[in-house]
UniProtKB/Swiss-Prot annotation:
GO cellular component, as recorded: photosystem I reaction center; plasma membrane-derived thylakoid membrane
Family: Belongs to the PsaL family.
Keywords, sorted A to Z: Membrane, Photosynthesis, Photosystem I, Thylakoid, Transmembrane, Transmembrane helix
UniProt subcellular location: Cellular thylakoid membrane
Example of a GO biological process term: photosynthesis
Membrane protein topology class: Multi-pass membrane protein
Entry-linked SUPFAM superfamilies: Photosystem I reaction center subunit XI, PsaL (SSF81568)
Gene that specifies this protein: psaL
Highest classification ranks of the organism: Bacteria, Bacillati, Cyanobacteriota, Cyanophyceae, Synechococcales
Transmembrane segments: 108-128, 165-185
UniProt-recorded name of the protein: Photosystem I reaction center subunit XI
Primary location class: membrane
Length: 199
């Protein structure tokens, strides 16, 4: 400990609170005090969780609740598989058509490899979210999602979701690569490539 730290700790050790400002009637073990700040009810305007026509409308609720992340009755692994397949399939196009090798013969393969690399990075981030020391955050029910999946927000559920995401992402990228490589798209591919050509 340096001289400055020692002198600072010695000067602050003598600080005492005035007894007239201490409320001894409230103890940390009181149930009412401990729980009153942890409860965040749905549609509380003080927290900003409002039921608006957008987030509580029929179309929005039907759309959000049918996404693989919130759909009822499927396992965390299948949730990850379906989400990863959508990511891999949709990321393949921008990587192959706008990548640095877009004007070469290797554009489709480079797009596949870049997409698989991006899926690996996203999978690594999902693994870090489930790092030891804290469990994944459990989403409370709100105006849009009444019943969030409880099995997903455990350590094993999130690990299953992550492994399914990796497999689905790589599989979706390979499926998009196979579709683009078919003979039916040979007439369209030069047109699409020339849209983003800069030279």
């Amino acid at each position: 400990m340096s001289d400055f730290q020692k002198s600072f700790s010695e000067s602050t050790s003598s600080i005492k609170f005035d007894e007239k400002y201490i409320d001894n009637s409230v103890q940390p073990n009181d149930i009412g005090i401990a729980n009153q700040w942890a409860v965040k009810p749905v549609s509380d305007p003080c927290v900003g969780n409002l039921a608006t026509p957008v987030n509580s409308g029929y179309f929005t609720k039907a759309f959000i609740n049918n996404l693989p992340f919130y759909r009822e009755g499927i396992s965390p692994n299948f949730r990850g598989l379906e989400t990863g397949a959508a990511f891999g399939y949709l990321l393949y196009g921008p990587f192959s058509m706008t990548g640095p090798l877009r004007n070469s013969d290797f554009a489709l393969t480079a797009g596949l490899l870049a997409t698989i690399g991006a899926v690996h990075i996203l999978t690594g981030l999902l693994v870090l979210y489930n790092a030891p020391g804290k469990a994944p955050n459990v989403q409370p029910p709100d105006a849009t999602v009444y019943n969030p999946p409880a099995d997903l927000f455990t350590r094993t559920g999130w690990a299953d979701f992550t492994s399914g995401f990796w497999l689905g992402g790589c599989g979706g990228a390979v499926f998009a690569w196979l579709l683009v490589g078919t003979l039916h798209l040979d007439t369209i591919m030069p047109i699409v490539k020339n849209i983003w050509t800069t030279g």
